Amino acid sequence: VDPESPMNVRVELGDVENIGQIPNSNFEAFHEEKSGLTKKEDQADHWHSFINSETTALTSSAKMKHNWKSNDVRPGSTGTSSLEVKSRTVLGQSANGTVTTGRIKAGSITAEDPANCSYLDLSNTEKDKKGDPYYTILTCKPDAIEFWTKFFVGKREESNKDNIYATISAAITDGTYYQDPQDNDNYTNVVATAKNDKIESLDNTWQKLTVPFNYKETDKAAKAILVTISTCSVPGGGSLSDKDGEQDAIKIDDMRLVYNANATSIKFKGEELTEEEGVYYTTFNGEVKNSDLEVETDSKSAYVTKSIFNTEDGVIAIINIVSNDLKTANRYVILIEGATT
């Protein structure tokens, strides 16, 4: 591409597999996971559930099947499977169906106790039956997490009739121990978080959701991501039935981390510029510097560069915005008539 061509060019740098993405986020790969001699489930590769959770002597009954491989896929999918997660009952209590990129810890018989959590820790050397670790490495900084879901609210009683939402949460950390929900307010290893605890059923139809990340003011580097999905936003607040058709059930398909690279505002010497047929025009009689151009983007982590060139008609400024995963770039061209460098 000619850098001095007066065009706004969008460049797709290609889809390099798994860079900046969660492995198997399309939920096409599954393996059999077992607990003991009789308990087993089809578990999505790189994702984990209660069947391979950490338990205590009092909570060992939590190791039961919650996950299923489903052939019900989102509209327009090129794949053939999705992940289905269902609630179960344990000792007469509702056990929310949960899946995570980390590991589940069932540390208490009290549902709302933060000893019941998902966690990641890059120093953890344990692996699942397939050989995958209980964490997901991520060194990029996405702007949002996007996924397709179909949610069914199971049987409700008077005591839990208002508990009608599923939930997803994500945390990007520096890779040291982190759990969700947090057991204290002293975690300083968080880079960004995203959460939606109001996932509705919409009559059990497929819906596409996007949840933005909120970035912290921190010098910690992104090294890992913990994503957790649950059939109920209230711990132990879901269906009290283990019958098919009465359990809470959520299906997840085609998840991806979103990396933006768009300009939301371009200013020259404080004046907002508008685009006309792919070019931003303005006039100025005098010398132009890169610092005269202000750019705002829809990403806190995109890379922005500015260049200026003399032409017969004035100055052409080129603004390049590259997404944090380096897969997408946008170019913006500004013609400043009458100016010099």
Regions inferred by a protein language model and the residue ranges of each:
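Short edge beta-strand/loop segments characteristic of extracellular beta-sandwich folds
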Residues: 146-150, 294-296
